[in-house]
Amino acid sequence: MPIIAFNSATDGLDPSRRSRGHFVADTRLDDDGPWVPYAEGVWFQPCCFNVTSGGFSVVLKGLPGAQLGVHYHVGTVRGYTMRGHWRYLEHDWVAKPGTFIYEPAGEAHTLVITDDSPEPALILFIVEGGLI
């Protein structure tokens, strides 16, 4: 995707100067190659990054029993569970395939793939803003 440089703040208001390209990410969920190590037993595949807001979209994969450290989101988070079971230690629900979650900005939590998950968990996360 080309980078467009503007001479002034109002240049970007001209619809003819805006980028209209689409971006398509092939996540290849069953391929071992494109996964980035994140924590013990946890990997992610980046789908896109918003360099303006710090937001990002990723597919997270975790083995049963794997856990991320407690973390904090400065913006909202949406998650959709495609495979496996997972939860936050700070809540009493368990996400299973088909579960959609919404997190308000400012929540701190600890993600855990449940020990009894029948397979590695695959979750699509769309994060607005940074992760601390």
What residue spans do the PLM features occupy?
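Short acidic-glycine-tyrosine-enriched beta hairpin
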Residues: V51, L89-A108
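Residue-level recognition of well-ordered beta-strand positions that form the cores
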Residues: V59-K61, H85, I126
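Glycine- and acidic-residue-biased ligand/ion/polar-headgroup-sensing regions
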Residues: L63-P64, H73-E90
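Short histidine-centered beta-strand/loop micro-motifs
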Residues: V58-L60, L68-H73, E90-W93, V112-D115
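A short, N-terminal "cap"/entry segment at the start of jelly-roll beta-barrel domains
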Residues: M1-G54
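Conserved hydrophobic/aromatic beta-strand scaffold that supports enzyme active sites
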Residues: F44-P46, S57-V59, R78, F100-Y102, ...
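Ligand-binding loop in jelly-roll beta-barrel domains
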Residues: A95-K96, A105-I132
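Short, charged/polar surface micro-motifs in flexible loops or helix N-caps
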Residues: T52-G54, L63-A66, H85, E107-A108
